[in-house]
Swiss-Prot record:
It catalyses: (6R)-5,10-methylene-5,6,7,8-tetrahydrofolate + glycine + H2O = (6S)-5,6,7,8-tetrahydrofolate + L-serine. GO terms for biological process: glycine biosynthetic process from serine; tetrahydrofolate interconversion. It comes from Bacillus cereus (strain ZK / E33L). The keyword Amino-acid biosynthesis applies. It is found in: Cytoplasm. The gene is glyA. GO terms for molecular function: glycine hydroxymethyltransferase activity; pyridoxal phosphate binding. (6S)-5,6,7,8-tetrahydrofolate binds at residues 118, 122-124, 240, 350-352. Catalyzes the reversible interconversion of serine and glycine with tetrahydrofolate (THF) serving as the one-carbon carrier. This reaction serves as the major source of one-carbon groups required for the biosynthesis of purines, thymidylate, methionine, and other important biomolecules. Also exhibits THF-independent aldolase activity toward beta-hydroxyamino acids, producing glycine and aldehydes, via a retro-aldol mechanism. This is Serine hydroxymethyltransferase.
Length: 414
């Protein structure tokens, strides 16, 4: 297939080859990224990309859907087996659209929702004023404690009692600690609210039984299918059976047309991988690597938000190094370490500058990195940030990155 692309469109082929080279040669620490299997990529690049399939298995608006029906049913059944969900919709094109569908199912414009502050670890779709969620609905924010940088559940309860939200959103995009979903449901029940959990970042850890499962506690659970779940880029919704018809209607015809059946096939393959015994080993290694990396960074004198991690994610506060998150992201990329600048709790800098850097261990763990490599990465990050204006030091860091990545070849058949 790549040979056809190379012959037909040299420019696109060259860009893809360059990206493959980047992924092979750099240390990927963006917490929301991962490396899918060749099987997942083959499914996504299959002839299913040709098929329109508006509707759901057995109830399509197009003919010729008998085979894509099988694929979608496989995907849904596997998710139910993994997470114990009563109903699953695997059609959302993204996590944002999954969240939108839940909002459209139970909220009216202007309804009050309680969600996590973006700079404290939340997500754009949890009420940011620049996102549809913050425009359409009246979001009230909760956050983390100023000292511990952990969610203060008493504060969440107090705000829930004060504002009487119709929906409470739990889950985060930059929160390195375990979230108490049972406590969130108790709070929701106390004020008569629905509970939605966005488990996008931790879905793979939940699938492996290494993080509390929100499904028994939440009315709705949304997630992406990539990140720690190691599938293609996409979303899905898990919910109680009582909301099944409403959720499905919110996705189609509510906010989407035809589903991307080639992506759903890739999702099904990834879900099958998540059911294998070695996936639990993989997820445990993600956590082990994150803990080791956090310890190494702290030994190097770096400050971590909340003092460490319980999952795959680490948030570094770079202010004591007298640099910004923007500078840190740039200089690390210069030596071959890919991260993203990120706001930290009680942020004072612009979101385009930030005081933090977010990193994660899902992708490097997929590549085969272990504890020794985490020690080297911690050393590399600290060395690079402390010497960010020293070109000789940066050149040394580049060589160390190259030495590390060369030991772990990836996608050798591509």
């Amino acid at each position: 297939m790549v040979d056809h692309l190379k012959r037909q469109d040299e420019k696109v082929f060259a860009a893809i080859e360059a990206e493959l080279g980047r992924q092979r040669s750099k240390i990927e620490l963006i917490a929301s990224e991962n490396f899918v299997s060749e099987a997942v990529m083959e499914a996504q690049g299959s002839v299913l990309t040709n098929k329109y399939a508006e509707g759901y298995p057995g109830k399509r608006y197009y003919g010729g859907c008998e085979h894509v029906d099988v694929v979608e049913d496989i995907a849904r059944d596997r998710v139910k087996e993994i997470f114990g969900a009563e109903h699953v919709n695997v059609q959302p094109h993204s996590g944002a659209q999954a969240n939108m569908a839940v909002y459209f199912t139970i909220l009216e414009q202007g309804d009050t929702v309680l969600g996590m502050n973006l700079s404290h670890g939340g997500h754009l779709t949890h009420g940011s004023p620049v996102n549809f969620s913050g425009v359409q609905y009246n979001f009230v924010e909760y956050g983390v404690d100023a000292e511990s940088h952990r969610i203060n559940y008493d504060d969440v309860l107090a705000k829930a009692k004060e504002h009487k939200p119709k929906l409470i959103v739990a889950g985060a995009s930059a929160y390195p600690r375990v979230i108490d979903f049972k406590r969130f449901r108790e709070i929701a029940d106390e004020v008569g609210a629905y509970l939605m959990v966005d488990m996008a970042h931790i879905a793979g850890l939940v699938a492996a039984g290494l993080h509390p499962n929100p499904v028994p506690h939440a009315h709705f659970v949304t997630t992406t299918t990539h990140k720690t779940l190691r599938g293609p880029r996409g979303g899905m919704i898990l919910c109680e059976e009582q909301f099944a018809k409403q959720i499905d209607k919110s996705i189609f015809p509510g906010i989407q047309g035809g589903p991307l059946m080639h992506v759903i096939a890739a999702k099904a393959v990834a879900f099958g991988e998540a059911l294998q015994d070695d996936f639990k080993t993989y997820a445990q290694n993600i956590i082990n690597n994150a803990n080791r990396l956090a310890e190494g960074l702290q030994k190097e004198g770096l400050t971590l938000v909340s003092g460490g991690t319980d999952n795959h994610l680490i948030l570094i506060d770079v202010r004591n190094l007298e640099i910004t998150g923007k500078v840190a992201e740039h200089v690390l990329d210069e030596v071959g370490i890919t991260v993203n600048k990120n706001t930290i709790p009680f942020e004072t800098a612009s979101p385009f500058v930030t005081s933090g850097v977010r990193i994660g261990t899902a992708a490097v763990t997929s590549r085969g990195f272990g504890l020794e490599e985490m020690d080297e990465i911690a050393s590399l990050i600290a060395y690079t940030l402390k010497n960010h204006e020293n070109e000789a030091a940066l050149e040394e860091a580049r060589k160390r990155v190259e030495a590390l990545t060369s030991k772990f070849p990836m996608y050798t058949d591509l």
